[in-house]
Amino acid sequence: MGAASGRRSPPLLLPLLLLLLPPPPVILELDPALQPGNFPADEAGAQIFAASFNSSAEQVLFQSTAASWAHDTNITEENARLQEEAALLSQEFSEAWGQKAKDLFDPVWQNFTDPTLLRIIGAVRTLGPANLDLEKRQKYNSLLSNMSRIYSTAKVCFPNKTAPCWSLDPELTNILASSRSYTLLLYAWEGWHNAAGIPLKPLYQDFTALSNEAYKQDGFSDTGAYWRSWYDSPTFTEDLERLYQQLEPLYLNLHAYVRRALHRRYGDRYINLRGPIPAHLLGNMWAQSWENIYDTVVPFPDKPNLDVTDVMVQKGWNATHMFRVAEEFFTSLGLLPMPPEFWAESMLEKPSDGREVVCHASAWDFYNRKDFRIKQCTRVTMDQLSTVHHEMGHVQYYLQYKGQHVSLRRGANPGFHEAIGDVLALSVSTPAHLHKIGLLDQVTNDTESDINYLLKMALEKIAFLPFGYLVDQWRWGVFSGRTPPSRYNYDWWYLRTKYQGICPPVVRNETHFDAGAKFHVPNVTPYIRYFVSFVLQFQFHEALCKEAGHQGPLHQCDIYQSTQAGAKLRALLQAGSSRPWQEVLKDMVGSDNLDARPLLSYFQPVTQWLEEQNQQNGEVLGWPEYQWRPPMPDNYPEGIDLVSDEDEARKFVEEYDRRSQVVWNEYAEANWNYSTDISTDNSKLLMEKNLQMANHTVKYGTWARKFDVTNFQNATMKRMIKKIQDLERAALPTKELEEYNQILLDMETVYSVASVCHENGTCLRLEPDLTNLMATSRNYQDLAWAWKSWRDKVGRSILPYFPKYVELTNKAARLNGYQDGGDSWRSMYEMPFLEEELEQLFQELQPLYLNLHAYVRRALHRHYGPDVINLEGPIPAHLLGNMWAQSWSNIYDLVAPFPSAPKMDATEAMIKQGWTPLRMFKEADNFFTSLGLLPMPPEFWNKSMLEKPTDGREVVCHASAWDFFNGKDFRIKQCTSVNMEDLVVAHHEMGHIQYFMQYKDLPVTFREGANPGFHEAIGDVLALSVSTPTHLHKINLLSSGDGGYEEDINFLMKMALEKIAFIPFSFLVDQWRWRVFDGSVTRENYNQEWWSLRLKYQGVCPPLARSQDDFDPGAKFHIPASVPYVRYFVSFVIQFQFHQALCQAAGHQGPLHKCDIYQSKEAGKLLADAMKLGFSQPWPEAMRLITGQSNMSAAAMMTYFKPLLDWLVTENGRHGEKLGWPQYNWTPNSARLEGPFVGSGRVNFLGLNLEEQQARVGQWVLLFLGVALLVATLGLTQRLFSIRHHSLRRPHRGPQFGSEVELRHS
């Protein structure tokens, strides 16, 4: 609010102590020519006295105002001193003339017949501060100067920094207006109230005492009584209360509506729907005007934006142009243009030369009838355009009444002066007028647009009413003594809560002086004038609109260019304060009372709308929980520079998503090219794209970290940004990132291109050679050679890289806020007790595994004999049909419960029928589409690698599904063999593709599984149906789909060899890695701890002695490829939960293991709905969509295998099997390891690879060494298999899904 005539303004900084202030000003004497003469003590003499006073007062007031202007536009000690000197001279003048008026006319002046003279003498005889003696007068002036300086130079500095420090205008004002960050707003609010308010309190106490002392000598009870006297009404305070009660319902409805909108943004933590609103959230430092949060509360956001700030900026408006536009409005009414002095001398922008100035907008009358100025740090905004009209309204008033006696150059009452500019602003802000001046393209006169406009006006006008009312309620209490200094702040907040329904956002006490943080308090500008003006301006507006011939709703009136309205306004302005304001008001509006009815009429449409909205929402009007206060934000104030504006966040994620699709697509293409053609060139390109991806991640992740999402009400936005904030490996410094990427590439390359060779030069690759050997051979020595050779070649080669990989993984994790790499990986599950819950699931499944283990061990004992199989010990790891003993389905022929029953392996039929890898994937596609799911797109068939190339290329054979992030390109890379096992794998991989396609329209951030296990489970769910004899019969791979009990047990055994056998391995791999990451497993015991866990959970042991020179974990793809593994454990549990739920949806009746959901659209819909969520919601929501509940459970898996478990328990009982491996330190007879390796012509003699002749001679020569070696081996084995107990660490955070998937080979 602008002050009239020479009022001071704002800025910010803690003041100097009074002891450091300059000495009191030099005592100056009033020019004798300005002293009053002698006049007759009658009415005629009073007329001469008034004329003489007028000419002298103009000179003194000009000098005083000029000194104040010089100070307020350049705050220096020298200018402060000159201002105080001018104030003393002005007070000396007032004392001389005021005392003369009292001496001459006090006995007679109230009987004067000239009412104008009566008003002049009454004004002159009021001395105010001039009543004080010189010493007190000097102190009074010094207090005013210092209070103004403290307020105007106060600054708020950024935490722990000396710069930048914020001034009130423009920095803090802009923050309060535009920021939506709860913590930044809080810091700005608290900082300003502390910086400006606290140092003012002792000065204000002293000012109050001196001011009261001065006005009591004029016959007033206190300063407040003097201020109220300007309104010439004995019932003034009662009239104000009556007006406020009339207007309060409108305010309460606005308050409730805005509180609800803020609740949507800030949530329950910071907004209580039955309590007051925290004062810093309303777009203004004092919560007096709320239009800056219009974007948060706009009723109909799709309608044209009525805040034309952006248009003003686009059109190049500047401060001068804004004032020219305002001037043109006045002149269009036939009123006066601004004089040359106005344009030459005004300060319309904040100076850029470093001067401290009082930025608070104010209009100045220099009392020489030609010099009128405005001081405003104007910003190009719509709000400031209204302020420009407001301030120019003051100047127009000065121009119109400049011919009046100097004592009457005031508004009819102070509210009149404040109302004039605002009356014009009511027209300026209408859409019709904004269109006329080129700031709005079109005017939309529909109900929704009207409600938008009126709500915007209500945020300015109605929101202000209680504040406009309470400020002087508080000051009148201070002046009267009802509010002593010990209760300054308490009473201030009592009134603000009582009338405004706001509360301080931080704890306040009597060390604070929050009233002093409002310009008008330290600058001693009475405030009730603004409340009065907000009522008057609508009375004026209604009268002027009528004069202008306006037809229609009052809020649509624009008096622009109406000279009739201008003439009526001119008559009011020219009267100044020469007549009672009631008379002037009656001439203007036809009534001599303040009346709220025009205001209520103006806002009637939005009042009705607010009432309806609040009733619909069940809003509580008022704040019954008035004592509620918001909690302090976590880690305040460290995070104040973070952005919490959801609109800004939305723009960020939109840009991130657009760019990510490009970057991720390029990376996927480079990765594909390398994986399908391992070459130096492709390696280099992949490294380049890897670095590009890292740079992208760093750029946007760093940007994302500038957002504080704590109070985001949009959960999706919050989730997205939190995910982007995790930079993963890209958090590493550039050199270390390059090193890390090279390590990963080197490790994966070692794994992918490795081959093992016989002495005769025959070399075997993992795919398909070693895999087939492990699957089909039953020769103990051949299997041992393949098992050991692979680990010698791959594991030992990877070991040198691994410690550095661990170090950099941990460093990246810690840079992202995690404890270590394992903590980071676990975070993807969003489960605070992930490890404990996984352990619980494992324990639930362990009985099934132990019975399967005992049964298989008995079968292997029958085949290999007691020398290498101990019925109470672990199973040698190379005998289970798989390089890692993770899936045992390849030894089904050795363990089949009923070998004479019909076989259910469709491999033979597939080969006979001429199936190809392409046919296998077409069949998988058919399964998905039969459920109503999406078919594979053309790009899939054109670009996938479904077979191992025959052109000599080195490829990564490990099956994987690929999303190229363009919404149409999805591929599978698989070295497919024609067998039933790979048919199942084809469905698994296509499950990933189906997932990709279902969530392809989500933001890139959410294009992954609900948790990593979900992605793995989807394809396997379908495989559970595909594997059933019923389904194999449907697709003509089995002659019959129905079997008896024996066939059922055989089928379940085959499934258990794949599913149950895998459970402990999938559980332990990351148990080992998590311990490596947390440091409890070090390089010195990598291998020992690996085998300790494999023994503990799987009950397997190495077939040969292992040492710390070996690195057997590295022989498993996911270790060098850095792919988290516990996802597979999770997927194996939840796939059975999904299967059970989908079978129920499909209407299946009977045992769960016989269910085939093929062609069930109902099951497909459940699956599709869950997949469409991607990662957009926590995984329990996706689980609930499919299963109806939100927890992982082993119950469905146990139900599926219940018939087999019953059979196993009976069978194991019949043979007296020991469950578990009590003789855990047993190892297979090493003598069985001697003998020829297949095709090599060489033998292994006590671990040495020798020619046969060398071995025979060496048997005798090295007998003693052999015995010693055997003893040493047994000792080492004892140490290897000692079971260690490690404390489980609590999970926290983790990585995102990688496209590599588990492949179980046949």
From Swiss-Prot:
It is found in: Cell membrane; Cytoplasm. The active site is at E391 (proton acceptor 1), H520 (proton donor 1), E989 (proton acceptor 2), H1118 (proton donor 2). The modification Phosphoserine is found at S1299. Chloride 2 binds at R791, W1090, R1094. The chain crosses the membrane at residues 1257-1277. GO terms for cellular component: endosome; external side of plasma membrane; extracellular exosome; lysosome; plasma membrane. Residues 29-1256 are extracellular. InterPro entries: Peptidase_M2. One of its GO terms (biological process) is negative regulation of gene expression. Chloride 1 binds at Y231, R529. Residues 1-28 form the signal peptide. Belongs to the peptidase M2 family. This is Angiotensin-converting enzyme. The gene is ACE.
